[in-house]
Each structure stands twice: as structure tokens, then as C-alpha cells.
């Protein structure tokens, strides 16, 4: 056992870390920061497109598109640097995003407009759950299809059922798999 595994918070980031890679990507501190940034960017984009089209220059549109499509790890690291000063995670996200529009005070002043930290956090957590669901759903659907196939193949295979550990009326393996 290596020291990293020994100091893990749980087996999920210790001995099972290889099996939880997708989960860690989404639910890590980095994942949360990136989701917060994404929510801020999408809100700013929505707000500008619906209420301040006059500020949507080609350069601003390009910046928003780039930020929306790929948030670099370096931006998340910048958020953590700012957070040391602000002691506020969402404010740090707001300030790091404002730096991306350096020199454009009009855009900077609209970042986080009409939003609370809870708005950012609740949507970010919802997106994280949606993303983990999407990444695991195909795996679960595969299991469901295999169980359905197994139930169909064994629909006539009689077996003794049990109630509270005691023998009960006969059933079929297919039925029991379907119930499962």
C-alpha cells in the first residue's frame, strides 16, 4: 500500500481511483469550479443576447464561445488564487471571469448581474449530476438489457421461491430476475 492510498479520504480516491475517474473529473474541486464558470459564462451570454446586444462585438462573442466550449485548468487555478484573497468561492469565479474581459469594463460590470451565489451553485450541482448521469447511464442500460435478456431466456425455468428465508410457492427464474 502506498502513502497516497493510505491518506485517501475514502476507497473511492484510494484503491478504486481508476474505477471512479469519470466521477472524480465531474465532482472534484476542479469540476465544480469549471461548472461554476460555465454557468457564469452561459448566463452572461444569455443576458447580453437578450438585454445588451449593443455590447456583443465580434470579439466578445468569440471570447464567450471559447470560454463556453473549453474552460482551461489554468482558469480554475486562477480562481483558487483569487479565493485565497476573497475567501469566497463564487466571488473568486466572478473575478477570474472578469479578468478574461480585461479592458472591457462594460462586460466586466455585467458578470454575475442579477445572480446570487446560490444561483450559481445550485445550477452547477445540477449540471454535475446531469453529467454523471449521462456518463453512467449507458453502462446501466447495458446491465438492464443483459438482465432483460437473461430473464427472457429463463422465463420457463422453474425454481423454489422463498419468503422470509422459508420455502414458498414455485416461481420461475425469469420472473425473479424481472422483479429484481
Question: Which residue ranges define each predicted feature?
Answer:
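A helix-coil-helix interface module used to build multimeric assemblies
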Residues: 2-180
